[in-house]
Amino acid sequence: MPTPFVHLHTHTTYSLLDGATLLDPLIEHVRWLKQPAVAITDHGNLFGTIPFYTKARSAGIKPIIGCEVYMAKGSLLDKKPPEGPRDFYHLILLAQNSLGYQNLIRLVSHGYTEGFYYKPRIDKSLLRSHSSGLIALSGCLDGEIPTLLRQEQFASASVAAQDFLDIFGPDRFYLELQANGLHQQQRVNQGLIHVHRELGIPLVATNDCHYLKRGDADAHDLLLCIQTGTTITDTTRLRFGTDQLYVKSSEEMAEAFRELPQAITHTNLIAEQCTLEIPLHRTQLPRYNVPPPHTLDSFLETLAQQGLSARLAQHSGPLDQPKYERRLRTELLTICSMGFAGYFLIVWDIMKFARSRRIPVGPGRGSAAGSLVAYALGITELDPLAYDLLFERFLNPDRVSLPDIDMDFCMKRRQEVINYVTEKYGRDHVAQIITFGTLGAKAAIRDVGRVLDIPYDEVDTIAKLIPSQPNMTIAQALAEEPKLSALSASRPSVGNLLSVAGS
């Protein structure tokens, strides 16, 4: 039985329009292969970290958190058109522990906030400052050392290797060998082995996985066409030129590196050294500074009572004031006992700023409209008692979860609010939520049809046969729409289109 292998260079769909592997199938496949751990190393981001971490641990697979970062050839602050085809290299970073994870987060964040130029880039100076707790691999053919070897700059490749050795030390930097069927890779492997012998840097085997199984290579090729806006018939398009970048078995990897067994053994050594535990479900809210002698709770109570009095004073017609006061006390007790007084004060402060600048704000939506405290503070404009709205749908002591208050601001002046919050709490405490766009069934058919050079009218006819229902999949559409299934069965080109678009 071969030594278990651990994939340390793996791209998922979070390598946007580059990786074709979904998290659930990846983890299930790794478990089926009886491999004890797996790393994700998506391009320039950590988007998949938390879902990958939780899913892998639930499946009994050790998750290794990493990233394939973009290394600027000079300073990350240099932002000018590159002299060659690109002005960055690739490098694999893996988090050993909590310190390494924090450093990885800092590096990736700096790439976006300071070094973004076509790609989120870092540089060696920044890497040197945040290398603790990280293991580095030399990367794919686009890594600095492999690139120099491809260019036959062997002395420069050794100098670059020594740079990384100085940054990470002899136990945390590895030369990355791959067996992917590419002629260039074979030449680079020989160069890496020479550097290994010259400098004593250990070797490690990876496979730069971009799709799950070998049979997915063609679908991945189409994904690259979608990324680059080209078609399958374009001879100048980006292509990988191999069908070997899949999640291989331990047996396949052992056979590929039978003359260098230490490269396989080192994958397990690295996996053992990666002991990161991510503390999940720990709420860390920004601190709202209240005027003395108030506490968070007492300040919220004071504002809420004053706000309710002002609201009720504007009320016309009969009014059950004791009912409002009881409801306010009940809500305040729940909010304060759950530790969310500061959260309400933060939201109140943001809304107060917007209104003071005459920035149009929404009246409130979602379950927060059921909170009398939110109404009293001016966060919402709906009286929940007038409409019999339940506070418990918003915040329930029997189901502890963070409150969620949606705030809507005028699109043209939204940035003013963001700037205010950033200045008040600090740039390192404010982030915007990302939304990932995905291809629905109809869009996937149209994109794949374009890539396959199928006439638009024909593709449009097929796409229109997909039922217009939320979350409709191509497999579901084939089962529900007889015309679509008949067309797929009678015309191989349509069947291929649907098969690829649904993969």
Question: For each of these PLM feature ranges, what is it?
Answer:
Residues 1-503:
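Alpha-helical scaffold/interaction cores of sigma-54-like transcription cofactors
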